[in-house]
Amino acid sequence: MNSRTLEIRRAALSAGLLALVLLVVAGIYLGWSRGFREEPQPAWVFESAESRFKYGSIGAEHDAGVPYWIFYVLPRVFPEKFRQDGKVAPGGYAALGVAWEQGQELPVGFTRKTIGFARVANNCAACHTTSYRTSPDSNPVFVVGGPGHTVNIENFFRLLIDCARDPRFNADILMAEIDRVTDLDIIDRLLYRFVIIPITKKRLLEREAQFAWIYRSDFPDWGRGRDDGMNLTRYFMIRAPMDDAFGPADIPAVWNLGKYHAETGQLPNYAGDTHDVHSVMVDSALGVLGAAPANKADFLAQVKWLQDYLSNLPPPKYPFPIDAARAAAGKPVFDAHCAACHASPRTGTRLPLAEVGTDKGRLDTWNKDAAIKANRIVAGMGIDRRGLVEEDLPGYKIPFLDGIWLRGPYLHNGSVPTLRDLLEPAADRPKAFWRGYDVFDPVKVGFVTEGEGAKQVGTRMDTTQRGSGNQGHEFGTTLGRADKEALVEYLKTL
């Protein structure tokens, strides 16, 4: 073999190796670009603090995100799964009772972010945004930081699993529907068909075992505006075995969190089960992520921003006229019958169950052992926080009453529809009512819970069911009618 031929072969080999290297590099880049490349959200999301709270990512797209185009077409492929039986409420995701601003592609609390491909996840606003209307014909007002009394969280959890279990959740059917609404390029089409759809189905079905308890026939539905938060922590964070504990609670308001002062014994959460607001923010955000954060520094920065924002977020002002004279008459009634708990050093501390007498289901879902395990898991992530209180829970926290007019239904489990009903003995309170309707009742102070409108969108609250008892807190029940009405008028001012 002459030197010329050898040089040609060497050149060809070098060119071939170079081409192979370039091909490998291109493949790696393509895989990174289409699978992992993270893009910032659009600038409009961050134009205001409120917009960021509503639509800003907290990092949940990494592990809990649903591919955007799958999320988009699920209501088209499975329309029957998005409807409540016998209801004429809107279909699609609106049927879940989410707050949805006109002109937005996604509901409040649903975030869109590209990590290789566009994904949809949730943030805190999905549960902590209140919708109210001043009349059936008026447009909704959305109040960030308020309790999401209309949202049906349990149905959302079930919905994703139920869709994944359906034989129609396959590449042929989903891709046919995706093709009707968008024009993916060839690479994305192949990724969706052979990678994204199969993996999404697999991961949703993997959640089924962890969510088995929400399918139990002996557990009542949570209904709109409630969740079983401590059981979610037990089954997802510490992977506890399923037991019979059941304690649904109203989604709380999270405005004005700066009012809590841990050094004086004021504890957040319904049962005072967490040492301070920072710990609540960390644990709640971890719950939304569903896994350890992909980027711990970014996660903690998001938590700090949320805590600062919510600590300084004021409660909403009452939107209807207030009878000033009646409210003034209600102030001494409040001072005599309510202030010792709700406007004193006791506020934010625990009241023993024997003293308040309310439903104990929420207390039964948490204990010292669970707190120790949860604290150990978070510490293992390298996250520093004071954490959950490592003791059994003796009672419920005495709540602050800021913005109390918009926090119905009342008691920790939402078993009393209005403030006026709360001033009646337990035996005289409504035994059942519709919850999740957003038309406000300015007379009784709460939401309208009866009538055709409430029936068509609401879920039925039956206070004889487990975890939903309306007993207890029989304070002010012996007041005269005039004093009760004056007290309710005063509470509108808080």
Predicted regions and their residues:
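N-terminal Lys/Arg-rich, disordered targeting/topogenic segments
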Residues: 1-8
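Periplasmic c-type cytochrome electron-transfer domains
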Residues: 9-18, 23-494
